[in-house]
Amino acid sequence: MEHIQGAWKTISNGFGFKDAVFDGSSCISPTIVQQFGYQRRASDDGKLTDPSKTSNTIRVFLPNKQRTVVNVRNGMSLHDCLMKALKVRGLQPECCAVFRLLHEHKGKKARLDWNTDAASLIGEELQVDFLDHVPLTTHNFARKTFLKLAFCDICQKFLLNGFRCQTCGYKFHEHCSTKVPTMCVDWSNIRQLLLFPNSTIGDSGVPALPSLTMRRMRESVSRMPVSSQHRYSTPHAFTFNTSSPSSEGSLSQRQRSTSTPNVHMVSTTLPVDSRMIEDAIRSHSESASPSALSSSPNNLSPTGWSQPKTPVPAQRERAPVSGTQEKNKIRPRGQRDSSYYWEIEASEVMLSTRIGSGSFGTVYKGKWHGDVAVKILKVVDPTPEQFQAFRNEVAVLRKTRHVNILLFMGYMTKDNLAIVTQWCEGSSLYKHLHVQETKFQMFQLIDIARQTAQGMDYLHAKNIIHRDMKSNNIFLHEGLTVKIGDFGLATVKSRWSGSQQVEQPTGSVLWMAPEVIRMQDNNPFSFQSDVYSYGIVLYELMTGELPYSHINNRDQIIFMVGRGYASPDLSKLYKNCPKAMKRLVADCVKKVKEERPLFPQILSSIELLQHSLPKINRSASEPSLHRAAHTEDINACTLTTSPRLPVF
């Protein structure tokens, strides 16, 4: 009871939590005081002793039903006396007006200037109110299911069910409610008031200035120290509930479960934090373009801004800011390029062994969170157009995920353009067939052909043309698992003339289609040109040799294949090669590209061929005693039973 009496005594005296004086017998927790909203009564004036009789003080009534008593020293202005009391409550004198209460005229007050000598007001009662055109910071939260893609403004994670302020548009998860800033203001009005306190008020009641967008406000809040954010946004801070009824869209004020945050506790009426406002305006002023301030002489106001009758829409784009600070700042999720997450710093990759060199680059074995293959492309001083084309193709390659495709892991742009891919411990198909001369069974060769066709079918379904399909770019990973690499990248497989991309014959000569060699079209590469290269790979599998081995001159091969005088010798195919495979090889290497099949048809043909191959199945009537892990697992009684019974 003593605690309750002390609480009522404190509330009846009208002190706020921060200014309340508690004696030892009347100490109560903030939660008890928070349940009682302060209501100033006329009888309160007679209960308090006049502060002028004891010291040089002034009693001040503040917004949100708060009050304080300030000490006055000689030479201090009214602004100096009240600055600290306003600052701890997040107020600014420019946003408020001060009045002297006239007791001889009940209910009336006289406005004072902030530069008034405070000594002349000792013993008086003052009242500080918000200016009429300065909005309060009351959030208007409502539950919302975001059917469109949305992200939490606090944790930047995907948001489906959460809350949204109907006034400022701030959206967040329920578990992020403790970090919601208390700011919910018309930032254009705040900015106009602070930048141009003496400007002429327009027809709408406020100076007509470009408004500060919500995005910039949130960026300024994100730059605040964590301690400052928690100071003004924590739900455990003492707040004063207003006596006005809550809006329809606000959350219910009933007591919630202690396991879930009370979102309403951050939606109480609080003043705007001055430091947050200054930070937002400072960042906006630095980023504003000087040309935005220019206007015709007829439309200029005394402050240098135009004053249209209708509000000026918020600026949608922010002027670029140069400097290292902008580079080091984390970019918002909505503005960051998705390929940003795939770019690898060159300092993070350690190159070790040089694996080989091709017509488009050099391959190294490297370390980046494990073994990787790094292909440094032969592109010296890429132009902006070439660099952008490379990034566009990387955006396509990073979406490839298939069991028969070499995994793309990232790219590098510093010093040289480079591609980082999965490392395959096995050798390439070229080494197996022509260097190590590995002897494969026919069913193994057919399975390699099927996996290769399956991977190429996936690439073509993604509208990716390989352009350099050959046995050197087919890897056998962990046994006989096929991995296709070095696909796409038309940027580095083309010749550039200034800013224009010019197609040229690319790839190894033996695997190049006749139309690619002739280069009669602007872009001869197509799905059918990849099919021709795949047909040469089938020829290697079914013969163990390279085509045109009897011709030693490279230029002669180019001339004869391009003119249609030479084609792979199909008589060298293995004798045990199935007839369906022979027909498939012949169809893939046809000289007219329209007559070649596409990979969906090729894949179905090989799968049908695999099912038709004869298989030796184990007899189901004979036991497999040798499969037992231990001989004692076999029941000895079974072995000594009557000969009439079967032995298992």
Swiss-Prot record:
This is RAF proto-oncogene serine/threonine-protein kinase. The lineage of its organism: Eukaryota, Metazoa, Chordata, Craniata, Vertebrata. Zn(2+) 2 binds at residues 152, 155, 173, 176. The gene is RAF1. Residues 286-301 have a biased composition (Low complexity). It is found in: Cytoplasm; Cell membrane; Mitochondrion; Nucleus. Residues 239-271 have a biased composition (Polar residues). Binds 2 Zn(2+) ions per subunit. Monomer. Homodimer. Heterodimerizes with BRAF and this heterodimer possesses a highly increased kinase activity compared to the respective homodimers or monomers. Heterodimerization is mitogen-regulated and enhanced by 14-3-3 proteins. MAPK1/ERK2 activation can induce a negative feedback that promotes the dissociation of the heterodimer. Forms a multiprotein complex with Ras (M-Ras/MRAS), SHOC2 and protein phosphatase 1 (PPP1CA, PPP1CB and PPP1CC). Interacts with LZTR1. Interacts with Ras proteins; the interaction is antagonized by RIN1. Weakly interacts with RIT1. Pfam families: C1_1, Pkinase, RBD. Its cofactor is Zn(2+). ATP binds at residues 355-363, 375. Changing residue 641 to M: In CMD1NN; shows a mild increase in kinase activity. The modification Symmetric dimethylarginine is found at residue 563. It catalyses: L-seryl-[protein] + ATP = O-phospho-L-seryl-[protein] + ADP + H(+); L-threonyl-[protein] + ATP = O-phospho-L-threonyl-[protein] + ADP + H(+). Its EC number is 2.7.11.1. It comes from Homo sapiens. GO terms for cellular component: cytoplasm; cytosol; Golgi apparatus; mitochondrial outer membrane; mitochondrion; nucleus; plasma membrane; pseudopodium. Changing residue 335 to H: In a lung adenocarcinoma sample; somatic mutation. It is linked to Noonan syndrome 5: A form of Noonan syndrome, a disease characterized by short stature, facial dysmorphic features such as hypertelorism, a downward eyeslant and low-set posteriorly rotated ears, and a high incidence of congenital heart defects and hypertrophic cardiomyopathy. Other features can include a short neck with webbing or redundancy of skin, deafness, motor delay, variable intellectual deficits, multiple skeletal defects, cryptorchidism, and bleeding diathesis. LEOPARD syndrome 2: A disorder characterized by lentigines, electrocardiographic conduction abnormalities, ocular hypertelorism, pulmonic stenosis, abnormalities of genitalia, retardation of growth, and sensorineural deafness. In skeletal muscle, isoform 1 is more abundant than isoform 2.
